[in-house]
């Protein structure tokens, strides 16, 4: 008898928790999304820093994989990509499906979550909303940065390290992460 994965995980969690002798009650609720978060085609302002960091992470991961496959080391011995290669890699990065990202509520604040966005200890149980408008918003955000900075500048920043790439895309006086967004937004 084969059980579907969610049911298998539920039984596994119950078996683990039940084996400790004490009954532990866990509960989680999905974040409540406002109309902008549900329906707007753009990335909501309070999630732009997380989106930028996700884009920087994905660009770095894809460029690192491409360099590992490259067979042309530069003068320092590391793999340097040709302009056409890194341009193609960055374009494919932005065109990916972004399905591993979604919105989660952490400490009563909505955050974009996914690879490269972990900040401290994860809650013991949580619900993340994926799919919907989030993959398209992340793709549009990625292409926005390609247009704003260009592939050459992005690749040069990547070659100097992840922190430099993230600072280029997300930092600066007008960058998405330049100021802390208040946890509670005023309703109009």
From Swiss-Prot:
Organism this protein belongs to: Rattus norvegicus (Rat)
Cell compartment(s), UniProt: Endoplasmic reticulum lumen; Secreted
Family: Belongs to the MZB1 family.
Motif (Prevents secretion from ER): 185-188
Processing after translation: Forms an interchain disulfide bond with IgM monomers.
Domain of life: Eukaryota
GO cellular component: endoplasmic reticulum chaperone complex; endoplasmic reticulum lumen; extracellular region
Subunit structure of this chain's protein: Part of the ER chaperone complex, a multi-protein complex in the endoplasmic reticulum containing a large number of molecular chaperones which associates with unassembled incompletely folded immunoglobulin heavy chains. Interacts with HSP90B1 and PDIA3 in a calcium-dependent manner.
Name by which UniProt lists this protein: Marginal zone B- and B1-cell-specific protein
Gene behind this protein: Mzb1
Covalent S-S links between cysteines: 49-177, 52-170, 94-142
Biological processes annotated in GO: integrin activation; positive regulation of cell population proliferation; positive regulation of immunoglobulin production; regulation of B cell proliferation; regulation of cell population proliferation; regulation of insulin receptor signaling pathway
Role description: Associates with immunoglobulin M (IgM) heavy and light chains and promotes IgM assembly and secretion. May exert its effect by acting as a molecular chaperone or as an oxidoreductase as it displays a low level of oxidoreductase activity. Helps to diversify peripheral B-cell functions by regulating Ca(2+) stores, antibody secretion, and integrin activation.
Signal peptide residue numbers: 1-21
Main localization of the protein described in the UniProt heading: endoplasmic reticulum
Key words of the record: Disulfide bond, Endoplasmic reticulum, Secreted, Signal
Classification via PANTHER family: MARGINAL ZONE B- AND B1-CELL-SPECIFIC PROTEIN
